[in-house]
């Protein structure tokens, strides 16, 4: 290398470092207002109090949390945990979630080929998984649960008795429907502290069941509610 070019290379190296620093993941933290994580950008933590959070298709972020607002994640996202208090959480296909997915008042849906490294839990709301792997537990107090075709829950599935110590819980007079779909697997126990109607597909595999009597089925979908 011509030594006369050394200063030029040094300047280029410093410029590259500066550019890398500018592109480093940044946190977004606000009290009021929605947050959107755009595809092609790297984000740190996403936090708001009053507002929704959106992760566009292909977006990358750390944990995303809000108090009053929904969380909507597109296809092929990668994030930390997703949590809200008042709002649902919806993730598209092939989501990679490096933590738990949790809400209090709202439903949770994880699309096909998703991966969740933590738990999937809500208090008032339904849970739906499609060909999704959950490393932890799946649980709710008041809501239907569908462990859809090809899903794999490595922890337990639990439906808890509502607690008077928490926020008011909407209690339906209808039994909750718990569906374990074709080819689905729940490694841990299935524990029910409330009356539920539990459907388990003939091709599914589940752990020990307590608090409910499973109803086997062999059709692509569970029997309609009219037969509950």
Named regions from a protein language model:
Residues 1-228:
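Intrinsically disordered, low-complexity terminal regions
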């Amino acid at each position: 290398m011509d030594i006369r070019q050394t200063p030029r290379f040094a300047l280029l190296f410093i410029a590259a470092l500066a550019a890398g620093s500018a592109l480093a993941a940044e946190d977004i933290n606000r009290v009021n207002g929605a947050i959107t994580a755009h595809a092609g950008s790297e984000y740190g933590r996403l936090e708001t109090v009053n507002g929704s959070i959106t992760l566009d298709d292909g977006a990358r972020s750390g944990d995303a949390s809000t108090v009053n607002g929904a969380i909507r994640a597109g296809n092929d996202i990668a994030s930390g945990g997703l949590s809200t208090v008042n709002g649902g959480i919806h993730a598209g296909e092939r989501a990679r979630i490096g933590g738990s997915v949790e809400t209090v008042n709202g439903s949770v849906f994880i699309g096909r080929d998703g991966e969740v490294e933590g738990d999937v839990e809500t208090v008032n709301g339904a849970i739906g998984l499609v060909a999704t792997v959950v490393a932890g537990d799946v649980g709710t107090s008041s809501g239907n649960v569908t462990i859809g075709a090809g899903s794999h829950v490595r922890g337990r599935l639990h439906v808890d008795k509502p607690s008077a110590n928490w926020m008011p819980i909407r209690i339906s007079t209808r039994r909750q429907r718990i569906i374990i779909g074709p080819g689905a697997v729940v490694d841990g126990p299935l524990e029910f502290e409330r009356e539920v109607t539990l459907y388990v597909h003939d091709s599914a595999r589940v752990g020990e069941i307590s608090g409910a009597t499973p109803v086997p089925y062999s059709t692509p979908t569970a029997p309609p509610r009219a037969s509950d």
